[in-house]
Amino acid sequence: MDINELIIGAQSADKHTREVAETQLLQWCDSDASQVFKALANVALQHEASLESRQFALLSLRKLITMYWSPGFESYRSTSNVEIDVKDFIREVLLKLCLNDNENTKIKNGASYCIVQISAVDFPDQWPQLLTVIYDAISHQHSLNAMSLLNEIYDDVVSEEMFFEGGIGLATMEIVFKVLNTETSTLIAKIAALKLLKACLLQMSSHNEYDEASRKSFVSQCLATSLQILGQLLTLNFGNVDVISQLKFKSIIYENLVFIKNDFSRKHFSSELQKQFKIMAIQDLENVTHINANVETTESEPLLETVHDCSIYIVEFLTSVCTLQFSVEEMNKIITSLTILCQLSSETREIWTSDFNTFVSKETGLAASYNVRDQANEFFTSLPNPQLSLIFKVVSNDIEHSTCNYSTLESLLYLLQCILLNDDEITGENIDQSLQILIKTLENILVSQEIPELILARAILTIPRVLDKFIDALPDIKPLTSAFLAKSLNLALKSDKELIKSATLIAFTYYCYFAELDSVLGPEVCSETQEKVIRIINQVSSDAEEDTNGALMEVLSQVISYNPKEPHSRKEILQAEFHLVFTISSEDPANVQVVVQSQECLEKLLDNINMDNYKNYIELCLPSFINVLDSNNANNYRYSPLLSLVLEFITVFLKKKPNDGFLPDEINQYLFEPLAKVLAFSTEDETLQLATEAFSYLIFNTDTRAMEPRLMDIMKVLERLLSLEVSDSAAMNVGPLVVAIFTRFSKEIQPLIGRILEAVVVRLIKTQNISTEQNLLSVLCFLTCNDPKQTVDFLSSFQIDNTDALTLVMRKWIEAFEVIRGEKRIKENIVALSNLFFLNDKRLQKVVVNGNLIPYEGDLIITRSMAKKMPDRYVQVPLYTKIIKLFVSELSFQSKQPNPEQLITSDIKQEVVNANKDDDNDDWEDVDDVLDYDKLKEYIDDDVDEEADDDSDDITGLMDVKESVVQLLVRFFKEVASKDVSGFHCIYETLSDSERKVLSEALL
């Protein structure tokens, strides 16, 4: 075959010609891969060939390498191997193309990609000279291509072991330092070397205190040399080089400095050295600010972008060292620079004023962009005192004297917002005076007739931050809060600017964060405030897009939180809230934030609702819900965001039943059939998940007498969901449905229970979906909590794939317990497994499950692809032993979680401890960290005797468990230890010292 003809054919515009050529190329490769690879490499080498053909040759090699080069690739075909001498030729050609500075960029990039691919399987064993060639190119020619290639190899190929023990790290660092120290190396070469330094630092950051001394010494020496060189580089003057390159050079230096500061031990970067770099960083920030101030917007967009990127890296470094002492002069320099750098560009001002949605995205933190303002925010929120208090005074004073310079004023107000978000308290002399002047200035901005809308919007956002920060310092905080909120809302209602309205709505959430508005405003004014906010939401909602819709729902959620506690006394507000929930969410049903917030709003609206009001809302909503379901019948309920949203809303309505009874009959009458149809015909995973959840609540919260005639239809739905024709993901919520059916119809379905449970168990054993697995286990928890023996009897009565169901279920259950999270789910599993442990059943004693993972002990270096094909091996342990170990592990985890009550009483307890320290008659008995079983039992028996009169309720079924997880576990261990249940004594002896210590600390 002629390779040139195949390449031309494979690039043809005609689909048939293209497919024929591609097929022929693969067939040729299957018969003689070496010949094809050699032919493609020769085409890539030919400068007289067209660029397209050369590029296609490299793209073909890139694809074929994974199929014919080595079994190390997952897509390896093993039909024809590339011969060793051809491999050598290919490697040589690729390096020649990649390292040739005069080569076309596309060709260099294509060759580089192939090199990285091959090195992933060949380096270092089959390609030991790879790095030598690259190092030579860097050392002798300062090759940018070589440094770029080495960077890519570091990302994809070089392992930690290669870096430290294989000598690659040392060789690379020597090359990097050589390029950076050589005066004749170009600025571009130094930038490339600095990028390579970052790759090396990433490798070194994996080291820890337990590493060998040689690694520690290597890292320490490299970091010391790096810091020395980086400091020298910052002092270099490249007057004859373009500004953009100089700024990129500074950026990468500060990027490396930040990484060293944040990702390595403090001992490597002394405070004295940090101070020296801090001085240089402030100077560089001033220089960058000067460049920024003198750049015409139309002159150079790339220059402005580079200025802002460099600013971000410098401020990020200052943030990393912000715990150092800053002088007043240094702080003034930083504020002056950031005030200029954080000024909005004319383009941003135009975008925000013409489309308020972009403003909302940025202010709510949902915009994808990251700019110098964001980094300034990080800096100011990280500053400790006294710098924080100092900077507050400076910025407040600057605001007072900049009211006529609007661009500067907006920037200063933004910086003030950042300062106020710092968690530290702002203190110091004359703070009260500065605060009063600031509040007066902000008040003047609100009443001014000539202030531009961006300044007004920024002031509206800043005011609640000021009030929040100084809530304890302002004697008139309540009237101030009420007055400023009223002024902001009235301004927004009068204004025709959507920017002002949206800023006010965001600010409203800030007020809600620190103030209980119903208490601050009083019931009447609070209701008026709700009405105003609802009116503003209505005014902007028609033009709201994406992030703004989510923000509006968040505001609405806050509004609903202040609804009167009396049963729905203000119907106008409630109806308006309902209307907004449905209109905003239906405008953007694919928006995750909107869906989540709208559900939250609806749940709040339905809290403690009585039957009459519930029926009123159902009359409003139900017809539209059913219309959406019916309209999707024709396409078998194919996924759509609106259908999912409606199913979410239906679920909320069915879950939040009236507080004075079951769901009204109308719900069952009109919703049962549409939901049953969705569950009968849909093949969409998400649709089936949502519909199953709604259906479960419909059954659970409807009067059994009203639902009983539909029992056969319910069983048909259940049969489909438990069948293996429905995917694991789609059947995710079938567990709660089974529990709902068992709860409501235990007598009616008695003859079918065995079949249902067998289907549940089969589904549980087969499923690979964690959520589905955990929900199906809820059924077993339900059964075990009610009758553990009958549950074991049932599971012992049949087999799945020639293994008894009891063994399979217990293995699955034990594996699932380790990943279960969520308090209610953890509790039900603890109660159920506890019941099985107390049962002391011989059938359970015979079950063995996976214990600890057995580590690989061979001599092979296990690659990722090899690891995937090697099954994990575990020590096999008795079920009861594993239950104890799981419970100890859970107890250890839960005991480390902070307890609010303990936090509140910690000071009191500390006083008691201090008092007891001096008490010579202290009759506390010292307890060792780890107790043997007899000693443990002795302490517990004493404890049980003391608490014998406590009349604690027995835990049965799946009732609400008031005890915490820790209390449940402690009670379990006290009982099994005191009574030696199911051979606990023997199990205890097998526990590790750390496990015994957990029990000792928890029980005593």
Swiss-Prot record:
Q: Which cysteines are joined by disulfide bonds?
A: none
Self-association and partners: Interacts with NAP1.
Specify whether Acetylation is a keyword of the entry.
yes
Under what name is this protein listed? Importin subunit beta-5
Using the UniProt record, give the first listed, main subcellular location: cytoplasm
Question: Which keywords appear in this protein's UniProt record, sorted alphabetically?
Answer: Acetylation, Cytoplasm, mRNA transport, Nuclear pore complex, Nucleus, Protein transport, Translocation, Transport
Which InterPro entries does the annotation name? ARM-like, ARM-type_fold, HEAT_IPO9_central, Importin-beta_N
The keyword tRNA-binding appears for this protein? no
Q: What's the miscellaneous note? A: Present with 2940 molecules/cell in log phase SD medium.
Report the sequence similarity comment from the record. Belongs to the importin beta family.
User: Which processes are annotated in GO (biological process)?
Assistant: mRNA transport; NLS-bearing protein import into nucleus; protein import into nucleus
Matches recorded under PROSITE patterns: IMPORTIN_B_NT (PS50166)
Stated role: Required for nuclear protein import and mediates docking of import substrate to distinct nucleoporins. Serves a receptor for nuclear localization signals. Mediates the nuclear import of TATA-binding protein (TBP) and of histones H2A and H2B.
For this protein, what is any one GO molecular function term?
small GTPase binding
Highest taxon of source:
Eukaryota
Residues covered by the Importin N-terminal domain: 21-100
Q: Which residues carry this modification: N-acetylmethionine?
A: 1
Output the PANTHER family linked to this UniProt entry.
Answer: IMPORTIN-7, 8, 11 (PTHR10997), IMPORTIN-9 (PTHR10997:SF9)
Q: What cellular-component terms does GO give this entry? A: cytoplasm; cytosol; nuclear envelope; nuclear pore; nucleus
Give compartment(s).
Answer: Cytoplasm; Nucleus, Nuclear pore complex
